[in-house]
């Protein structure tokens, strides 16, 4: 039904009708297609639109105009399937380019295979520094990929899961066996100082032993320096007696001349009759071989006689005299105590 007859029908039946407008309708603008197949390179703007340009485009849009979708790639760009690269100095034919690309790909694959084989051969030859090439297809894995946790990727059956668990157990046992077979010195603790340098424990222990030995030697030397010549001679004589006692009989009788001479040489202040039986030798030389003083002298704790050059003057502080007086007083008190106990 034509528009005019429709308006008349509505006016006749319902008494309302929109008047026919003489305004021409807008037609959709058609974009001109540009053949880009013959052109070389197509440059597309990959930068995302910013807020300012988006707002400007939104204000300039016509509500009644056609909607343009900018995210869709052009048909010409999708239609361009062939490469527009040209070889300088040679014929730009499609068959030659395809052959060249195929040859280049074959050369790359051949070089990669040769490099992999050479690396694998070096690894079998015993080069520890060469990178190890590990195949993803393991005997226990069945050639399947595994996730980082060690489980197979994808769905598995109960048999596959049991086989995977058994393989993991075998790996753990093999690793534990390697750790047990490893020597103990390889597991020695590494000590480091504050700066991070490794400390040689054996060297430090040797230095500590050396320092301890030097300290002991210094102490012995200091103790030796405090001793006089007489003490050293007496110590040497005592050592000599111990050496001779090894060959000495256990029972020493009256026929032992050495023992008799030693007992006769002893002087006792409370045995005046001993002077009639034995002849005492006068002061001759000391233990060190030097002559002794022949006159009277103040007694001392060690019984050492003064040298022959002594002038008879006692230059001490009187300690020896007080020491003998204290010992005599203590002896008298003990004797009196014993007598008083007997009287009671």
From Swiss-Prot:
Alphabetical keyword list: Coiled coil, Cytoplasm, mRNA processing, mRNA splicing, Nucleus, Spliceosome
Keyword Lipid biosynthesis belongs to the record: no
Residue ranges of coiled coil: 156-246
Keyword Coiled coil: yes
Compartments, record wording: Cytoplasm; Nucleus
Quaternary data: Associated with the spliceosome.
Protein name, UniProt field: Pre-mRNA-splicing factor cwc26
Organism: Aspergillus fumigatus (strain ATCC MYA-4609 / CBS 101355 / FGSC A1100 / Af293) (Neosartorya fumigata)
